[in-house]
C-alpha cells in the first residue's frame, strides 16, 4: 500500500522559514505511486505554501468549524477550505481535544462537513498514559471512532485517513514500542473490519507520536502502519525528507 507521510507544522514558522522549508521539501525525490506527501501549515500561510510546493505535495488545514458561515469570529469553514485549494484537513488532533475541549461529537460534525467533498479528512484518535495504564486503551479508541463508524457509509469511510497518536508520545520524545504501535493499529483495523473487511484492508492508518528519521524505518515497516503524521521533525526539511526517503525505500523493497 502507498505510504502517506504528513507534516503537521502546528503554530510554527514565518514567511521566511516557511519559504526555506518548502524549498527544502521540494528537492526530495520519491515515487508518487509509492508515497504521498502532505503538510499542514498554519492557516495564514496556506496560500503561500500551496504556491511554493510542487503540485504533487498536498496541503491541508489543521482545523475548521462545523458552521457554514456567519458571525463566528476567528473561525474557518469547510467552504473556505475548498475555496483556497486545500487537499487535506486534520480533525480531532489531541491538542485540539485537550486544549480546546473538542469532543467526539465535534470531531464527527467537522468530518461530516467535508466527507462528501474532494478534501481528504485525517481523523486523529489516541489515548492518554492513564488510559493505557488503566487498561482502557481499546475502550477509548472505540469510543472516539463510534460516531464515525456508526453514521457514515462504507463509501464515505473509505475517504478517511485515521491517525493514531498516543497522547503521551506527542512532543515528549517518548515513542511507543513497535509492539504497542502494531497492536494498536491492528486493533483499530479490527474495528473497521466489523463494518466492512475490504474497508479495513484498504483504509490508511498512520502513526503520529514522535516519529522521526531515526525511527521511521522501523515504524513504517510495521504491517498495519500506512504512514506517519509528523510534528517537530517535519519542521526540518532534511529530516522530513529522510522520513520520505525511508517510506519510499520500504515501498520499493
UniProtKB/Swiss-Prot annotation:
Cellular localization per UniProt: Cytoplasm
Main EC class the enzyme belongs to: isomerase
SUPFAM superfamilies to which the protein is assigned, alphabetical: Triosephosphate isomerase (TIM)
GO molecular-function term, one example from the UniProt record: triose-phosphate isomerase activity
Pathway(s) where this gene product acts: Carbohydrate biosynthesis; gluconeogenesis; Carbohydrate degradation; glycolysis; D-glyceraldehyde 3-phosphate from glycerone phosphate: step 1/1
Pfam family, one: TIM
Domain of life: Bacteria
Catalytically driven reaction(s): D-glyceraldehyde 3-phosphate = dihydroxyacetone phosphate
Keywords in alphabetical order: Cytoplasm, Gluconeogenesis, Glycolysis, Isomerase
UniProt family annotation: Belongs to the triosephosphate isomerase family.
Record's function text: Involved in the gluconeogenesis. Catalyzes stereospecifically the conversion of dihydroxyacetone phosphate (DHAP) to D-glyceraldehyde-3-phosphate (G3P).
PANTHER family associated with the record: TRIOSEPHOSPHATE ISOMERASE
Subunit structure: Homodimer.
UniProt-recorded name of the protein: Triosephosphate isomerase
Gene: tpiA
Amino acid at each position: 500500500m502507498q505510504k502517506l507521510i504528513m507534516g503537521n507544522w502546528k503554530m510554527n514558522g514565518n514567511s521566511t522559514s516557511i519559504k526555506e522549508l518548502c524549498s527544502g521539501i521540494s528537492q526530495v525525490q520519491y515515487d508518487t505511486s509509492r508515497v504521498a506527501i502532505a503538510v499542514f501549515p498554519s492557516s495564514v500561510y496556506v496560500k503561500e505554501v500551496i504556491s511554493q510546493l510542487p503540485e504533487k505535495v498536498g496541503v491541508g488545514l489543521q482545523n475548521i468549524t462545523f458552521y457554514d458561515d456567519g458571525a463566528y469570529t476567528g473561525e474557518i469553514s469547510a467552504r473556505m477550505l475548498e475555496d483556497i485549494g486545500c487537499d487535506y484537513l486534520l480533525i480531532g488532533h489531541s491538542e485540539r481535544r485537550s486544549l480546546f475541549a473538542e469532543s467526539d461529537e465535534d470531531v464527527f460534525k467537522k468530518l461530516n462537513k467535508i466527507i462528501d467533498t474532494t478534501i481528504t479528512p485525517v481523523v486523529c484518535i489516541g489515548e492518554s498514559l492513564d488510559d493505557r495504564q488503566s487498561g482502557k486503551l481499546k475502550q477509548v479508541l472505540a469510543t472516539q471512532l463510534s460516531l464515525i463508524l456508526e453514521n457514515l457509509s462504507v463509501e464515505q469511510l473509505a475517504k478517511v485517513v485515521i491517525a493514531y497518536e498516543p497522547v503521551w508520545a506527542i512532543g515528549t520524545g517518548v515513542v511507543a514500542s513497535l509492539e504497542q504501535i502494531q497492536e494498536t493499529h491492528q486493533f483499530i483495523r479490527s474495528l473497521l473490519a466489523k463494518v466492512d473487511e475490504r474497508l479495513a484492508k484498504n483504509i490508511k492508518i498512520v502513526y503520529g507520536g514522535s516519529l522521526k528519521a531515526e525511527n521511521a524505518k522501523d515504524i513504517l515497516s510495521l504491517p498495519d502502519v500506512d504512514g506517519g503524521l509528523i510534528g517537530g521533525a517535519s519542521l526540518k526539511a532534511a529530516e522530513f525528507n529522510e522520513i520520505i526517503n525511508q517510506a519510499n525505500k520500504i515501498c520499493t523493497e
